[in-house]
């Protein structure tokens, strides 16, 4: 190799090495192509408990409407230890309304309580208080930015996902294109943090399961997923519709689903769901994530949640 050739070779090598170093450093700035989570395989370890059914006990400014002063109070920091002691479950879902604060001091205190209890946050259901499909772009941006806030909170608490409501003004028809545009931004942000954004068939007007699936398929981002709720769609539809809804939702589910066997409306009328069929559908779709117990039935939440756990253990293999 002559001097000129050798000099050029060394120069090129230096450039390539510098480029490789830059790429290696920048790799941490690029989002993962898909979520990288490891799920437990033992049935009980796939069970979580939602804080929503226990809202009448939880002390938090945003939860005053649900707090029953006749019952003993509970701060959210006490919830994970209760879940472990009472139910022998080590996963839970804290609702956004149940956080008395989201400042860094409280979040550190909360995470310490979670770790001390030997528990894990597996999802944070939140309401962005805005609409992802509003006709006003500025209002859609509010939803996206609030969603990003909860993604950051999920990072601080070690949660793999958030569940956000889609939201929408009462007289505005849900719009796939505007919803997809907004949620593309949130999913892309979640990807940079390895945090999944989940959509639940919760509100039967703004979050119809088949509307959700259209949005998911349009966005086509592995960080935007479905959160199938066993019974929510039964409030306005029949079992056949629910079966089709669960099949559509579980095709797009990844890490979290809500298990319940019944749900009541504002008039005290309860609807039940075919739980066995829901688990059959989840298994057929090779769902490997968590099932969070979200009791909504008659009676009190401790016994109701235990019943859901016992029922779930019959079907998980």
Predicted regions and their residues:
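N-terminal pre-domain/capping segments
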Residues: 2-156, 174, 191, 221, ...
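Residue-level detector of anion-binding/catalytic polar loops
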Residues: 15, 120, 160, 196, ...
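Acidic/histidine-rich catalytic cores of soluble enzymes
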Residues: 61, 91-92, 180-281
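Residues at the N-termini of beta-strands
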Residues: 91, 161, 256, 289-290
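Structured beta->alpha junctions
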Residues: 98-99, 168, 201-203, 238, ...
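P-loop/Walker A phosphate-binding loop and immediately adjacent motor/lid segment at beta-alpha junctions
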Residues: 114, 274, 278-290
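Active-site groove signature of glycoside hydrolases
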Residues: 153-174, 193-202
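Short acidic/histidine-rich active-site segments
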Residues: 292-296
